[in-house]
Amino acid sequence: MRTLYFVTSNPNKYKEVAEILKPHGIQVEWANIKLKEIQSNDIDEIARDKVLKAFRRMMAPVMVEHDGLILEEFGQIPGGLTQVFWDALGAQGFCRLFSRDKETAAVAQAVIAYCDSRKVELFRGSAKGKIVTEPRDYEDFQWDCVFQPDEYEETYSQLGEIKKEISMRRKALNEFAEYLKREKCIHS
């Protein structure tokens, strides 16, 4: 396989993705590029747009990731706009708006988009959980401190390394790795 670039301006996201893909025999190079994102509630639409922009910049096989929180009680928002809400509200404001002093059911969704010049492929992963009433153990992955996956008493940020094993991102990356093996993009 030619070099696969992961286009993101987030070094923590790159590190996590590289760690998850390594056991699959997939090595990714970091392309530290901030892509202008379209504003949409649709995570798939944002990921598809980002990967096409990334491919036009790199002219090589590229992958991007976009994730968000889907809250059915709020009409599927913030969805693809989670980062916009997060930037405007911060951790406390996010909890105040979306949990309103009670935990609110949520789905964390990640979409990996891949483009190799011939086509765009999307790979999805999701995790059910809830938005907690107060941020816990704020770390580098913004809303990880407010999302508590089902079957756990801790938020993603409190789970530390366990998060990498159960996250929506891992699920999407596992699908992506299987695709690359099946399509003979890598040798296993």
Description of each model-found segment:
Residues 2-5, 12-188:
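Anionic-ligand binding patches
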